[in-house]
Amino acid sequence: QHYPLGDMDGEDPMGELEIPSKSFYRQNGEPYTGKVKASVTFLDPRNISTATAAQSDLNFINDEGDTFPLRTYGMFSVDFTDEAASESLNVGKVKVHLDSTQVKMPEHVPMMKLWSLNPDTGLWEEEGDFRFESQRRKRREDRTFLVGNMEIRERRLFNLDVPESRRCFIKVRAYRSERFLPSEQIQGVVVSVINLEPRAGFSSNPRAWGRFDSVLTGPNGACLPAFCDDQSPDAYSAYVLASLAGEELEAVESSPKFNPNAIGVPQPYLNKLKYRRTDHEDPRVKKTAFQISMAKPRPNSAEESNGPIYAFENLQACEEAPPSAAHFRFYQIEGDRYDYNTVPFNEDDPMSWTEDYLAWWPKPMEFRACYIKVKIVGPLEVNVRSRNMGGTHRQTVGKLYGIRDVKSTRDRDQPNVSSACLEFKCSGMLYDQDRVDRTLVKVIPQGSCHRASVNSMLHEYLVNHLPLAVNNDTSEYTMLAPLDPLGHNYGIYTVTDQDPRTAKEIALGRCFDGSSDGSSRVMKSNVGVALTFNCVERQVGRQSAFQYLQSTSARPSPASTVRGRAPSRRQRASSGSQRQPRGVASLRFPGVAQQPLSN
């Protein structure tokens, strides 16, 4: 049986998998001779849109124990099950054929190896070498293939890679606003770089991406590894983007204004790097990434010695560079995300934790992040809120821990479908470690929505772990959060780490991917879902709450007191502090106590 790898229009496959008959066997070692259900997924580096779907940075550890980068010629995962899809099958003899004509850099051919991703370490491990083999394909010319052998014993991601040595570092910082103040730098931002293959005229494929890397910003920004070239400044280019808890940050504009002071890099080096934000030629494109030429700094050039590109051997200089040194910038924009903690806590500073029964994170240095995946079926993206209150603990019952708002992410392939990975307060021991609290969590889509379904395994778990929350309102969902970490089969994602930012990023990656061990930067709406809501667009002309309050005819008299709570408003706040969006006035009503956003 032959399985092609790659299906680019107008292009031959990168290669194929060849599996001889009678190669399958069960988990206990017994041969399997029945029908096989096969699934082969290939990430084709010739398609730039597949780069963000890569599950791991491309790194391996060499014989000396040093971490080195890889350049990929494609990644693939395989899943073989029996006819009933009840048991995963192992495969004893598998051949991987790589078309040598697809390897555009001749020096890479003898260096090509087959790698597999270790899910525990996140590093790639060598599976074997390739050998040359000439084959005559049907109705085609003779081709030379690189052939490697492997055995599939567990579900892993495999890779066709070569080690690469021409490396540099890119200095990037993230800020809370366009003021770019050093005091407003953000830690815990995931900054990612996609290394594009050399441009036309250089000895490689100008359309392919070769590497994906991600780094978390610290108190002094981040240094991202990327390929570079000192002989030809245009040889390699890099595509850089940044996100915080699923929220994309914005890069500094390059058109119509091109301000080196705002970008963070002085001339003439900036022109040499050819900085372009993604909307440079089309203002309709998102503004959340930029592309540069990876021109390695010349050692005898003063204007290139102070960043933002550093030679590989100058990593320490990159990491210790002051904010005044050249660097690229991202910043937060006012959006549809809101975080509120009853007990304030700065996630950039774990030492700001205080003892309190209502602390969102009850145990310092052991931060447990919990997310639930919510699918929205409807024409618009929707803000989804979690309202988190004490549920079973005598000190916290009925009291608010905090609120989280996030906007659903549109599915790339399905119209009228979006999904949200929504944080909620984990159940468990409170700060005194005396007894547990089952957090009462309300999941509330902010729109005209109707609950369509609840994950059957999650529902069964909650029924079997009493008490069971009441769910009479079909526009929302209420649960006493599970004590167990559960997993993607339930639509619940839980990660514990010494750093709250790291715990949240790992949990978010799993939630986006819909798996308990993988990670994705692309939302996969149909897998690992806990709740599904059907949402419709509000009717045109329907009176809003603000219009109602402004209407004199809607109130019996000017002296009347407005009863109930103030209407919620869209806003976002950085973790550790709440701030109001620009240009929105604070609305206060007589006789109504001001509260955090709530339903």
From Swiss-Prot:
Glycans are attached at residues 47, 416, 472. Residues 573-583 have a biased composition (Low complexity). Induction: Up-regulated upon TGFB1 treatment, and down-regulated by IGF1. Signal peptide: none annotated. Residues 550-560 have a biased composition (Polar residues). GO terms for cellular component: extracellular region. InterPro entries: CILP-1/2_8th (IPR056257), CILP-1/2_C (IPR056258), CILP1/CILP2 (IPR039675). Residues 550-599 are annotated as: Disordered. It is found in: Secreted, Extracellular space, Extracellular matrix. Specifically expressed in cartilage. Expressed at lower level in young cartilage than in adult cartilage. In adult cartilage, it is highly expressed throughout middeep zones. Pfam families: CILP_8th, CILP_C. Keywords: Extracellular matrix, Glycoprotein, Secreted. Cleaved into 2 chains possibly by a furin-like protease upon or preceding secretion. Monomer. Interacts with TGFB1. Probably plays a role in cartilage scaffolding. May act by antagonizing TGF-beta1 (TGFB1) and IGF1 functions. Has the ability to suppress IGF1-induced proliferation and sulfated proteoglycan synthesis, and inhibits ligand-induced IGF1R autophosphorylation. May inhibit TGFB1-mediated induction of cartilage matrix genes via its interaction with TGFB1. Overexpression may lead to impair chondrocyte growth and matrix repair and indirectly promote inorganic pyrophosphate (PPi) supersaturation in aging and osteoarthritis cartilage. This is Cartilage intermediate layer protein 1.
